[in-house]
C-alpha cells in the first residue's frame, strides 16, 4: 500500500521561505518512498467556519468546498505537513480557516468527544517561519497548529521553527537541508 502524506501550505507567497522549507521536507519524504500531495490554501476555494454546529449534529461540515475534500483525504494519509509563516504572532488567515474546519472531524456523544483521526496513527510535521529573530517573534504560530493536531490524536514528529528570514532566507541557508535530513534520520530510523 502506498504511503501518502498531504502538505498544507498556509502561506500566500509562493516560492518564499515557508514553501521552500516545506519543499525540503517533501523531498525527504519522497526519498523515503512517500507520495506527497501539496495543497496551496491561498489558491483553493475555502469557506470559514461560521459556528453553526452542523458538524456536531452530522459529523461533517455543511460547506462543500475544496477544504471539505482535503479533510476527507486526511482520513486516509500516513502523515500531514502543516506550514505557515507568522502573521501578527499567529498562523495566516488561510491556515486558520483550515484549522477551524478540522473541527468537523470531532465526534460528540455521551458527554465527551473524540476525533475521527484518533487511533489512525497519523503523524505530522509542523513548520513555522518568521522574519523576526527569535521564538517571541513566532508567537503562537507553531502552537496553533500543534494543538489542533494533538487534539485529533495526530503525533507530532518534527516541529520546525525557522526565524530570521530577513537576514537568512531559506534559499540562502546551506545548512538547513542537512539539518532537515538529520531530523528525518532521527525520526524515521528510530
Task: Please give the residue ranges for each predicted region.
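N-terminal beta1-alpha1-beta2 submodule of the flavodoxin-like/Rossmannoid cofactor-binding fold
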Residues: 1-84, 88-107, 157-158, 167-190
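Short beta-strands and strand-loop turn motifs
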Residues: 8, 126-129, 160
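Short, glycine-/small-residue-rich phosphate/pyrophosphate-handling segment
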Residues: 110-155
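Active-site rim beta-loop-alpha module in soluble metabolic enzymes
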Residues: 164
Amino acid at each position: 500500500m502506498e504511503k501518502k502524506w498531504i502538505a498544507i501550505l498556509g502561506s500566500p507567497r509562493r516560492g518564499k521561505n515557508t514553501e521552500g522549507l516545506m519543499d525540503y521536507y517533501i523531498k525527504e519524504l519522497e526519498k523515503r518512498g512517500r507520495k506527497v500531495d501539496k495543497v496551496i490554501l491561498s489558491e483553493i476555494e475555502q469557506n470559514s467556519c461560521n459556528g453553526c454546529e452542523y458538524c456536531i449534529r452530522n459529523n461533517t461540515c455543511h460547506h462543500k468546498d475544496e477544504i471539505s475534500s482535503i479533510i476527507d483525504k486526511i482520513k486516509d494519509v500516513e502523515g500531514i505537513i502543516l506550514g505557515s509563516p507568522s502573521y501578527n504572532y499567529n498562523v495566516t488567515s488561510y491556515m486558520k480557516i483550515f484549522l477551524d474546519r478540522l473541527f468537523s472531524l470531532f465526534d460528540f456523544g455521551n458527554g465527551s468527544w473524540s476525533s475521527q483521526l484518533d487511533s489512525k496513527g497519523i503523524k505530522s510535521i509542523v513548520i513555522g517561519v518568521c522574519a523576526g529573530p527569535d521564538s517571541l517573534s513566532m508567537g503562537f504560530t507553531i502552537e496553533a497548529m500543534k494543538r489542533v493536531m494533538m487534539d485529533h490524536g495526530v503525533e507530532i514528529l518534527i516541529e520546525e521553527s525557522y526565524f530570521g528570514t530577513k537576514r537568512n532566507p531559506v534559499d540562502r541557508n546551506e545548512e538547513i537541508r542537512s539539518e532537515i535530513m538529520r531530523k528525518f534520520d532521527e525520526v524515521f530510523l528510530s
